[in-house]
Amino acid sequence: MATFKDACYYYKRINKLNHAVLKLGVNDTWRPSPPTKYKGWCLDCCQHTDLTYCRGCTMYHVCQWCSQYGRCFLDDEPHLLRMRTFKNEITKDDLKNLIDMYSTLFPMNQKIVCKFINNTKQHKCRNECMTQWYNHLLMPITLQSLSIELDGDVYYVFGYYDNMNSVNQTPFSFTNLIDMYDKLLLDDVNFVRMSFLPTSLQQEYAIRYFSKSRFISEQRKCVNDSHFSINVLENLHNPSFKVQITRNCSELLLGWNEACKLVKNVSAYFDMLKTSRIEFYSVSTRCRIFTQHKLKMASKLIKPNYITSNHRTSATEVHNCKWCSVNNSYTVWNDFRVKKIYDNIFSFLRALVKSNVNIGHRSSQEKIYEYVEDVLNVCDNEKWKTSIMKVFNCLEPVELDNVKYVLFNHEINWDVINVLVQSIGKVPQILTLKNVITIIQSIIYEWFDIRYMRNTPMVTFTIDKLRRLHTELKTAEYDSGISDVE
């Protein structure tokens, strides 16, 4: 059983404040939610289990039980998860406030310990001090956290997470902030707490404390498309699709890292809860992560043979050709922007190949086919440029004054002509590697200009950012039919 979950369940009964703060969905009546196979730690109850997506940020970080409350670490309501979440620069005073909050919500003294032990011993089979019956008393105060970086902002969700070596498929990584505080001070806090426990439980408490307070922080993970709800990924092919999210809000006037101080003033905390409400937002999916997801899907469906073919139709309109026909049944082609990019890039590449007749040899064709498969994945800049360079070298360019040139005198479609005029200023007859890179980038940037895209989607924004963008009518940034250039 999760130690943090058990502690919340038992300590919830000791006073009115705890009853309000320590209420977890996992300790209440179970309500079904979409089951998934994503493994990790629920940020709400800290247990390692199967996770489902959060309605506040669409990432997988909540268990099927806790999802009924819809709590997100990005909320603006002072629930327990939000008060345990710290952001960016954390000071020693911030950590002291966190420790004080733990001490307030999970007090350890002779009266509390005796009360829990007496309640447990009412059952005949629980006369001995076995750890499974006193799990709630064995939660030490640590500075163990799960951290994540979202567009430059780093969030730390503190808690007590068991089984740190278990499978973690979430974008959160374990971070230990004890060095930012003081090991001896934290040791003293826990030794005092431990002194109230029966001797038979003290050893287990000490083992848990040192294992969770002396570990080495993990390397921070990169957020990718697999960390977001499958429901969102399945609808990315619709250019006008907007993600519906809900956030728990209140009139929280304190700084982000000061929310945990609210438990020191009970009346102020309950006054704050009276202002609680749910806010709904409909936000755009435009970001580098989701753009890369779409371009990668299209890359898997590439038919490189088209660049040496004589088809009169665009690349996605070829039918009944074993080597060049694209499988249009995939939903990625429902996004007309991806289709446009694919058609224009392959129109340009075919013109390059046809203009350089030496490419006609079969061995050269087979080489260029391998390199063409990565020409859409512009989000991975190094890999993409390497792919373009290898395609260029397959054209057997001529070198003059240390600059390599290839011919360009084959027909192209009107869309590519417009791109050439906009990016180079004319329709050239010879091209350098730099020209080729610029042209292909321009074809992609016309619809997905990743230079000006944030990395993660708007669903990972804080409430104040969402409100500001909503006021400026920027949460839904563009409708279908409008490109980034327009």
UniProtKB/Swiss-Prot annotation:
A Pfam match: Rota_NS53
Does Phosphoprotein count among this protein's keywords?
Answer: yes
Does the keyword Transmembrane belong to this entry?
A: no
The scientific name of the source species is Rotavirus A (strain RVA/Human/United States/Wa/1974/G1P1A[8]) (RV-A)
What is the protein name stated in its UniProt record? Non-structural protein 1
| Localisation per UniProt entry | Host cytoplasm, Host cytoskeleton
Q: Where is this region: Interaction with host IRF3?
A: 317-486
Entry's Gene Ontology BP terms: symbiont-mediated suppression of host cytoplasmic pattern recognition receptor signaling pathway via inhibition of IRF3 activity; symbiont-mediated suppression of host cytoplasmic pattern recognition receptor signaling pathway via inhibition of IRF7 activity; symbiont-mediated suppression of host NF-kappaB cascade
GO molecular-function term, one example from the UniProt record: RNA binding
Residues of the signal peptide: none
Q: How does it assemble?
A: Interacts (via C-terminus) with host IRF3; this interaction leads to IRF3 degradation. Interacts with host IRF7; this interaction leads to IRF7 degradation. Interacts with host CUL1 and CUL3. Interacts with host BTRC.
Q: What does this protein do?
A: Plays a role in the inhibition of host innate immunity by inducing the degradation of key host factors required to activate interferon production such as IRF3, IRF5 or IRF7. Associates with components of cullin RING ligases (CRLs) including CUL1 or CUL3, which are essential multisubunit ubiquitination complexes, to modulate their activities. Recognizes the host NF-kappa-B regulator BTRC through the presence of a DSGXS motif in the C-terminal substrate recognition domain.
Q: What is known of its domains?
A: The integrity of the zinc-binding domain in NSP1 is important for degradation of host IRF3.
Q: Where is this motif: pLxIS motif?
A: 480-483
Sequence motif IKBKB-like degron (ILD) motif, location on chain? 479-483
